């Protein structure tokens, strides 16, 4: 049921965005890509701010983490590292998966940390704090903002290239059109852009793996290396992760380094402190 809900929600949002792009194209012509870029960028920023507040409740139940030892440890660690944190929530991820996870979402007053109930069940409080130290590392290193800006820039370049090619008769003719059709130009561009997207994906994955190492190093620098390693091991077990993926497969598809590589890097960072 949840997969169907997610599919139809994605279909709805994607349809709205595509309709907006088509209407902007019809109304503005040559520079439609600029306006479309603005619309998509605004939507991306809006979702980054309010995803957890507006979208997550459609699929999961979120409740504030109750007062107690775990909340105190999280708040104390955040305070010690100069990280302002008020909103801490627990999500019922166990109703669909056994995977344990935690993540930060939003910015400014909408910033919140979300813990899966499976994470609370499987990890010790110290391990949970260590996992959150890793996430705080992403924020302190500005990884989240950098990735968002890179994504917005990538979207702008893609739309600009699309604007250069969409009115080319050859694209529509290649798909059987007798004249220029926006829809045929769109389909042809998607086909042509797919290899470019794959190359960009290689770069983004490599960048993401680098950021994961940096966030791990930040956590290790806070004195929680041992708990982070033990926590990552438990998370890996619940996720049924491959400990020794083929190097080329990891290079192409992995946004996170394999567990053994992360552990080795954390131990090096910890020993150098």
Regions found by a protein language model. Give the residues of each.
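Loop-to-helix entry region at the N-terminal start of transmembrane alpha-helices
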Residues: 181-188
């Amino acid at each position: 049921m949840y997969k169907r809900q997610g599919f139809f929600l994605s279909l709805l949002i994607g349809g709205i965005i595509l309709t907006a792009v088509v209407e902007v194209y019809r109304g503005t012509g040559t520079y439609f890509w600029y306006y479309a870029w603005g619309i998509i960028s605004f939507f991306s920023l809006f979702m980054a701010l309010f995803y957890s507040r507006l979208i997550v409740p459609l699929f999961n139940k979120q409740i504030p983490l109750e007062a107690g030892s775990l909340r105190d440890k999280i708040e104390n660690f955040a305070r010690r590292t100069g990280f302002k944190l008020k909103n801490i929530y627990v999500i019922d991820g166990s109703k669909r998966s056994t995977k344990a996870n935690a993540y930060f979402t939003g910015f400014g007053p909408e910033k919140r940390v979300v813990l899966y109930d499976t994470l609370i069940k499987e990890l010790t409080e110290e391990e949970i704090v260590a996992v959150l130290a890793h996430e705080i590392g992403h924020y302190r290193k500005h990884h989240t903002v950098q990735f968002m800006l890179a994504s917005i820039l990538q979207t702008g370049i893609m739309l600009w290239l699309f604007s250069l090619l969409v009115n080319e008769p050859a694209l529509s003719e290649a798909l059987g059109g007798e004249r220029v059709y926006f829809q045929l130009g769109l389909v042809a561009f998607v086909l042509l852009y797919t290899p470019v997207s794959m190359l960009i994906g290689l770069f983004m994955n490599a960048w993401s793996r680098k950021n994961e190492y940096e966030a791990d190093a930040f956590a290790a620098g806070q004195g929680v290396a041992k708990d982070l390693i033990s926590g990552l091991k438990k998370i890996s077990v619940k996720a049924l992760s491959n400990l020794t993926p083929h190097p080329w497969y990891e290079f192409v598809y992995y946004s996170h380094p394999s567990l053994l590589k992360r552990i080795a890097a954390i131990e090096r960072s910890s020993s150098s402190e």
